[in-house]
């Protein structure tokens, strides 16, 4: 199954119980959920590695008898065109100090990430989900403008950790086949404590 494009990326900060932090000050919003979209000029790339563990061949009687497979260790190289400044800093653990500054406070906070793409042939939605991990920003390049702008995208690395809701695995893939898939159920698994928005009665 081939996939094409990036439809969107959603992130949230999570607590020690892998529950979304529903607080605009301590988390990313009142609901805890932050959808990266047109206001951030969208996601450019979300390159996922480590979906399978490394393998070691097992030999016996001068023959290859088996393969021992390690655990998956996913990481996402995530590039956003213009991620909200405060959101970016909160995700990597730089918290506002009330004086216009942002400084690292303790350990890097844990976060969750959901990447949406679609199939080539029939445009069915596919989601790569990470319910627990840490976000880092290893570097920041700054360059002079010439006759052209020199832009530096927001480039972050998400390192996935074990997620309880995924049966102890580090990631889960969802496929919107139009029958079994329920988006609210997916959101509740990926973002622990998520509640679907209520549409006011007319």
Model-derived segments and spans:
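Catalytic micro-motifs at enzyme active sites that drive phosphoryl/nucleotidyl and oxygen chemistry
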Residues: 62-68, 99-103, 140-147
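N-terminal, charged/glycine-rich beta-strand/loop interface patches
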Residues: 44-66, 70-76
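Mixed-charge, glycine-accented linear interaction segment located at domain edges/termini
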Residues: 133-202
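Oligomerization/assembly interface segments of phage tail-like spikes and tubes
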Residues: 63-87, 150-163
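Polar/acidic, low-complexity leader/linker segments enriched in S/T/G and N/D
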Residues: 1-43, 199-202
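Short helix-loop boundary/capping segments
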Residues: 104-138, 143
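Charged, amphipathic alpha-helical segments
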Residues: 83-104
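Short, surface-exposed beta-strand/loop "edge" segments at domain boundaries and coil↔beta transitions
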Residues: 19-21, 86, 117-128, 166-168
């Amino acid at each position: 199954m081939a996939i094409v494009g990036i439809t969107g990326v959603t992130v949230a900060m999570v607590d020690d119980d892998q529950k979304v932090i529903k607080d605009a000050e301590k988390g990313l919003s009142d609901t805890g959920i932050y959808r990266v979209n047109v206001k951030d000029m969208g996601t450019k790339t979300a390159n996922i590695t480590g979906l399978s563990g490394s393998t070691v061949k097992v030999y016996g009687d001068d023959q290859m008898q088996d393969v021992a497979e390690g655990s998956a260790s996913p990481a996402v190289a995530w590039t956003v065109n213009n991620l909200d400044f405060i959101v970016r800093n909160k995700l990597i653990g730089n918290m506002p100090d009330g004086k216009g500054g942002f400084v690292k406070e303790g350990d890097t906070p844990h976060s969750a990430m959901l990447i949406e793409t679609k199939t080539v042939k029939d445009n069915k939605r596919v989601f790569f989900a990470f319910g627990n991990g840490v976000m880092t920003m290893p570097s920041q390049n700054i360059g002079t403008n010439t006759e052209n702008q020199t832009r530096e995208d927001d480039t972050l690395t998400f390192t996935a950790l074990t997620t309880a809701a995924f049966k102890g695995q580090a990631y889960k893939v969802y496929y919107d086949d139009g029958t079994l898939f329920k988006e609210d159920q997916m959101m509740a698994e990926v973002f622990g404590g998520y509640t679907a928005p209520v549409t006011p009665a007319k």
